[in-house]
């Protein structure tokens, strides 16, 4: 541990008011230091020493001595040139330490050019080419480095943050005697960033009073958390840049004479954004009062901005000790000891007669008086249980109140209203913004769940079409039950999933029938569809899924559809009576009953209102639903089997059913929305 006041090696300004960062030797302001032994020697000895160094460093060079091109180049430099260059550098350092003399710079540049020419003459052509490539690569890297580094960001040097902290502590100690607020405002402006925050954590204290929780003890655990110890107890304070000057002024006005900081070896890091962090695992802060001292141990972390200003000051206190001066307590202890000795002598002198009541009373009063006086000296009235001045903690609490009301103050100032009216309007505005944010989050969640369930259901539909007849029939019945339960429950996730599934089926129909002949779309009575032997009975179930999920029409429309389901005459010619004896007719009857039950339950629940608002093209979808219902019931009453949508990928040219007309109308209704035109949602179907 080293004491922070030991900063003899720093270039500290003499005046406390001269706030300047020039005392820190940054890389931009550093100069080349000449050798101290060279500066004190006479010129003749310097010349001889330089000649000896030049003789030792110069190695004769021959072209035939190169065995590889990649070896480092050894140059034949004349002793006169080397001596002249070193003399020029010494002259530059002596006359102009900052290196701003143009004449000396020109001479040095000429010397470098001449050396470069000599080096090129002594090289072979291959070596010259390699040197040119290296120079070009070096220039490119330098240009990239200058582009990446901001002009305001200084080059990083190890220890620069620690030196800045030493400067901070020096000016903190060398304050004026009058403790004026003007000095502290300049102090804060010099060492703190306008976005700076100073945090004090007291979470590791075992027993602290309610004053450690600030003005809002119930809300403090949810609003305040320490990043050093990781606890969220709410025991701590935070001060912003606006109140730092007043806070420091009150600290030294509350009886603190000096503030010392004992620091361990720091851990210094630099982040890619230019911020620098200085962390001390063990830091001891000592506040000196007139009659006592408070020693506090904790964890300190300071974050500096790229311009070396404090952006964050965090101190997590572990424990503290209150040290009293011995010279102040010793007289009171001696007085108490004398009173005790007097009582002992009184008892011994009384002998067998005993001590009189008057002597006992007088001795008791003397003991009590000495004890009270000692307790008075040991009692620290200006401090609280945390070892901080009470006025200082009270100021921190007030600053938190001001910070919480800052939004209200700005709102009343901008809108020119009073405090009560401003508070009312601000609460209404905050509630509106919060409600809108919740709605946006719900919409995003529904969209994500719908986008995830749409492709999954599409994959299930495509895989179910390749199964056998009986298996497909059972799967379609189970799928109808699942869809019916989801629609009856009315959950937003189920609604979004059904909507995406419906749009996927519409898109499949549009792709299957886009090449079909539109002139043959007059009705079922004039057509004789050719059935594919590979068609699955699950096609009717998929059509009924489209009916169950297409738009959720209103109650009168549902009743009309139920009437169509119950009493629609056969619209298909009975050209294939043998199809009525199909083994899958029983499964289709069960599907028809399930669909009828589903429509009744949806009518009773009245879940169609929200879906009518969600789909603008509702009338077209209702008409299409009615047509699809008529077509699906014809398989039971009339006998013509409807081709499967999945198998129509293989026989799209032979599919002359009137579904293309219905789908074209629906596709026109939904084509205005970009959501249904995005092929990426459905995996390129």
From Swiss-Prot:
Dimerization, as annotated region: 176-423
Q: Where is this motif: Nuclear localization signal?
A: 185-199
Name where it's found.
Nucleus
Q: Which residues form a coiled coil?
A: none
Q: Where is this region: Disordered?
A: 25-66, 108-129, 447-491, 512-591, 611-658
Disulfide linkage: none
What is one term from the GO cellular component aspect held by the record? Answer: nucleus
> What are the alphabetically sorted keywords of the record?
Developmental protein, Differentiation, Flowering, Nucleus, Transcription, Transcription regulation
Phenotype of the disruptant?
No visible phenotype under normal growth conditions.
Q: Where is the composition biased (Polar residues)?
A: 447-459, 512-524, 544-588, 611-636, 645-658
Sequence ranges of Low complexity compositional bias: 39-56, 460-471, 525-543
Q: Name one GO biological process term.
A: flower development
Q: Which Pfam families match?
A: LIM_bind (PF01803)
| Family of this protein | Belongs to the adn1/SEU family.
Q: What is this protein called?
A: Probable transcriptional regulator SLK3
Species, as recorded? Arabidopsis thaliana
Gene field: SLK3
């Amino acid at each position: 541990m080293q004491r922070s006041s030991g900063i003899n090696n720093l270039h500290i300004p003499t005046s406390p008011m001269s706030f300047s960062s020039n005392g820190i030797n940054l890389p931009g302001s550093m100069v080349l230091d000449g050798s101290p032994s060279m500066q004190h020697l006479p010129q003749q000895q310097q010349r001889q020493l330089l000649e000896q160094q030049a003789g030792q460093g110069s190695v004769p060079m021959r072209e035939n001595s190169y065995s590889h091109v990649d070896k480092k180049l050894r140059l034949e430099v004349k002793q006169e040139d080397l001596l002249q260059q070193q003399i020029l550098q010494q002259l530059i350092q002596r006359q102009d330490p900052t290196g701003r003399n143009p004449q000396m710079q020109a001479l040095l540049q000429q010397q470098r050019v001449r050396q470069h020419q000599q080096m090129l003459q002594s090289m072979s052509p291959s070596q010259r080419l390699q040197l040119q490539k290296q120079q070009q690569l070096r220039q490119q890297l330098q240009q990239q480095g200058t582009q990446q580094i901001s002009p305001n960001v200084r080059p990083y040097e190890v220890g620069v943050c620690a030196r800045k902290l030493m400067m901070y502590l020096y000016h903190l100690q060398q304050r004026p005697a009058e403790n004026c607020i003007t000095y502290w405002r300049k102090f804060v402006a010099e060492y703190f960033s306008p976005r700076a925050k100073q945090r004090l954590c007291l979470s590791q204290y075992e027993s602290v009073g309610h004053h450690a929780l600030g003005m809002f003890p119930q809300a403090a655990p949810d609003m305040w958390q320490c990043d050093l110890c990781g606890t969220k107890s709410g025991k701590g304070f935070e001060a912003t840049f606006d109140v730092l000057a007043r806070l420091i002024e009150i600290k030294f006005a509350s009886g603190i004479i000096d503030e010392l900081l004992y620091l361990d070896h720091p851990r210094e890091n630099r982040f890619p954004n230019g911020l620098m962090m200085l962390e001390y695992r063990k830091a001891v802060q000592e506040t000196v009062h007139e009659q006592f001292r408070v020693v506090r141990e904790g964890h300190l972390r300071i974050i500096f901005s790229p311009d070396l200003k404090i952006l964050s000051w965090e101190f997590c206190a572990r424990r503290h000790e209150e040290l009293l001066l011995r010279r102040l307590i010793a007289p009171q202890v001696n007085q108490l000891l004398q009173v005790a000795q007097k009582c002992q002598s009184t008892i011994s002198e009384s002998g067998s007669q005993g001590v009189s009541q008057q002597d006992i009373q007088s001795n008791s009063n003397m003991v009590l008086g000495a004890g009270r006086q000692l307790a008075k000296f040991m009692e620290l009235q200006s401090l609280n249980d945390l070892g901080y001045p009470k006025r200082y903690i009270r100021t921190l609490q007030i600053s938190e109140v001001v910070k919480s009301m800052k939004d209200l103050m700005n709102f009343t100032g901008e809108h020119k209203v009073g405090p009560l009216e401003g508070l009312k309007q601000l609460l209404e505005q905050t509630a509106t913004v919060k409600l809108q944010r919740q709605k946006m989050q719900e919409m995003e969640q529904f969209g994500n769940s719908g986008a995830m369930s749409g492709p999954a259901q599409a994959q299930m539909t495509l895989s179910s079409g390749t199964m056998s007849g009986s298996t497909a029939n059972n799967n379609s019945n189970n799928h109808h039950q699942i869809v019916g339960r989801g629609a009856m429950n009315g959950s937003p996730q189920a609604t979004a999933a059904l909507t995406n599934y419906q749009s996927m089926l519409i898109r499949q129909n549009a792709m299957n029938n886009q090449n079909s002949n539109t002139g043959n779309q007059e009705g079922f009575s004039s057509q004789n569809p050719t059935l594919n032997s590979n068609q699955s009975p699950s096609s009717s179930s998929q059509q009924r899924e489209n009916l169950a999920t297409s738009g959720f029409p209103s109650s009168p429309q549902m009743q009309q559809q139920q009437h169509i389901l119950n009493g629609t005459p056969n619209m298909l010619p009975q050209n294939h009576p043998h199809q009525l004896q199909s083994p899958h007719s029983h499964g289709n009857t069960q599907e028809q009953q399930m669909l009828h039950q589903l429509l009744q339950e949806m009518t009773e629940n009245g879940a169609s209102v929200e879906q009518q608002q969600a789909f603008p093209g509702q009338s077209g979808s209702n008409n299409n639903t009615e047509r699809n219902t008529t077509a699906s019931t014809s398989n039971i009453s009339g006998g013509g089997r409807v081709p499967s949508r999945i198998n129509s990928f293989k026989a799209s040219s032979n599919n002359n059913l009137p579904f293309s007309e219905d789908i074209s109308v629906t596709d026109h209704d939904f084509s205005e929305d970009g959501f249904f035109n995005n092929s990426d949602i459905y995996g390129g179907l």
